[in-house]
C-alpha cells in the first residue's frame, strides 16, 4: 500500500501494488491498444522483462520511470504514463538544470540560462554533448526509451524534460558549441521555480501591422493592414473558442484572405476543430475517419488451434487464401481486428468565409488540431505552410492508479481522409518552411511571413 503523511504521498509502494499496476497496464493495452499491427514487439515477453525491473525500484520516481519505459514500447503519442502530480511538483524528483533549450533545425539550442551562467553558457549555442556523449547518441540511449519518439520533430519537449529534469542536486556536464568554440559547463539541478532567467536580448517576433479584434487566452484574431484575417488558436480543448470566432464573423467576412495558425495547438475536442473548419466548408462534411479495436473471444479461441496462423505477419496476410472467418480469427488472435467509422459533422457556422486560406502547422500541432488539418485538407483548397504535424490522433483511455499517477492507452486511431499516411509522421505541408537559429535571433516568424506572401500574391 501507499502510506500518507501530512497529506502527501510517501515514496514507497508495496511489491503487490507494483505487480498489480504493471499487470493492469499490460492487460488494458492488450485489449484496447489501437496499433498492434504497427509495433513489432512481443508484449507478453516485454511484460515479463519489466516485472523484475519494476520490483527492484526503490521509490515512486524510479517506479514510474519503469512504467514509462514499458509503455513507451507501444510507440504512440496518445499512449503513455503520467507521474503523480505531487511528485512532478516536488523539487526532490523534478529539479532542473538551469538552461532552457529549444529544438531548431534538428539541434537543441540555448534560448536562456540562469543569471549565474550568463558568462559561461553561450546564448544560441548548440548542445553538442551530454556527460561527454554525443547528444544524438545520448538522446537515443537515455531519453528515447522513456518517451514516444517515433516522430523526432514532435517529441522535442519530452526530450528536453528528459535532458534537463531529474533529482535535486544531480549533476551533468553539458558541452555547447558556437562560432567554432566549445564550452564545457558543469551544472547541478535546482528548484525550477527559483531560477532567475537571463533575458536573451532578442526582439519579439515581428508581426504584420493591423487591428486585433479578438484577444482571448486560447484564440486571437487580427486583421492585417493588407486585409488578411489571422486566426490563432492555441487549443481545441476550450469549448468557447468556436463561439468567440463566430462572434466576429461579420468582420471576418470582409477579409481578403485567411490564415489559421494551429502551430503549438495540442488538440482537445475535435468537435471544436470541426466547428472552426465549418466556416470554410459549404454544408455538412465528413470528419475524422477512424478505426477502433473489436474483440470477439470465440474467434480468438478458434484461432489458437490454427497451425497455419503461426509465423504469419500482418503484412503477409494478403497473400493467404483464407475465408472471412479465418481472417477474422487470425486478426482476433493478434488484436488487430478493427471496426471502421466516419463521422458526419453538422455545419453550425453562421456562414461561409470565401477567399484564399493558409493553415500554419508544425510538430506541436497535435491530436484534434491534426483533425482540423485533416478536415481542411479534405474539404477546402487551403495551402498548408510550415512543417509536418505530430502524427498522433485518437481517443486515449485513461486509468488513474492507486499509486497516484495515471496511464493512457490509445483506443481509436484516426485515418487521414485524403489517404495520406500520417501515423507517427504527421500531415505534410504544401509549403515547407524550416525555422533557423537566425530567425530566433532576428525575431522573425518566417512561417507567418511565407503565408502572408502566398495570400497577397
PLM regions: where:
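Active-site diphosphate/adenylate-binding microenvironment
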Residues: 1
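Flexible, low-complexity junctional segments that flank or bridge functional domains
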Residues: 4-293, 300-309, 388, 393-406, ...
